Curated annotation (Swiss-Prot):
Similarity-based family: Belongs to the bacterial ribosomal protein bL28 family.
Protein name: Large ribosomal subunit protein bL28
Gene Ontology BP terms: translation
Keyword entries, A-Z: Ribonucleoprotein, Ribosomal protein
Source organism of the structure: Staphylococcus haemolyticus (strain JCSC1435)
GO cellular component: ribonucleoprotein complex; ribosome
One Gene Ontology molecular-function label: structural constituent of ribosome
Disulphide bond pairs: none
């Protein structure tokens, strides 16, 4: 599985870089994902979690 928030499902989205001439090049907007240890089914597990989920208290670290 790729880098995706274990709690909220946030992942990278796509968009464009725009030059002064407004030429478009594809780019990725990466979510602010942090690898943290949380309890999953009563056992500690390292998963990717978004910073937004950590700040809002949806996840507690072990």
């Amino acid at each position: 599985m790729g880098k995706q928030c274990y709690v909220t499902g946030r992942k990278a989205s796509t968009g464009n870089n725009r030059s002064h001439a407004l030429n478009a090049n594809k780019r990725r907007f990466n979510a602010n994902l942090q690898k943290v240890r949380i309890l999953v089914d009563g056992k500690p597990k390292k998963v990717w979690v978004s910073a937004r989920a950590l700040k809002s208290g949806k996840v507690t670290r072990v």
